[in-house]
C-alpha cells in the first residue's frame, strides 16, 4: 500500500505538524505494470466493496480497425513505444497510450490494463 497524503515537510524543508493522522481513503496501490506474456489477472477489492481487475500479464489484445470498423482478438508480439515511460518499452510494459506490435500491425492501447483487466487497442495506419 502506498500513502498518498500530504507531506510532513514544507517546501523550505521545515517540518509540518499534522493536524490529524493518516486516513484509509488516502491509501493507493502500486501500479500493475502489465507485461507481455501468458494472461494473468488479479482481483482487487476497491472502495464500496466493488472489484477491479488488475491485468498483470497479457498475450492478446482486442484490436479495432478504424477503416473497416471490425474488431479482432490478436496476439501481442511486443511493445514498440510507450509515452508514459521510455524504459517501459524494453521491459515490455503495456499502459494506456502504448504502441504495441500485433499479428495484424501496430496498434495504440486505449484501455487501462491495470484498471480494466483487458487490452483494447486501435490499429494505426501503415506508413
Swiss-Prot record:
GO terms for cellular component: ribonucleoprotein complex; ribosome. Signal peptide: none annotated. GO terms for molecular function: structural constituent of ribosome. It holds the Pfam family Ribosomal_S8e. InterPro entries: Ribosomal_eS8, Ribosomal_eS8_CS, Ribosomal_protein_eS8_arc, Ribosomal_Se8/biogenesis_NSA2. Keywords: Ribonucleoprotein, Ribosomal protein. One of its GO terms (biological process) is translation. Residues 1-24 are annotated as: Disordered. The keyword Ribosomal protein applies. PROSITE patterns: RIBOSOMAL_S8E. Part of the 30S ribosomal subunit. NCBIfam families: eS8. Belongs to the eukaryotic ribosomal protein eS8 family. This is Small ribosomal subunit protein eS8.
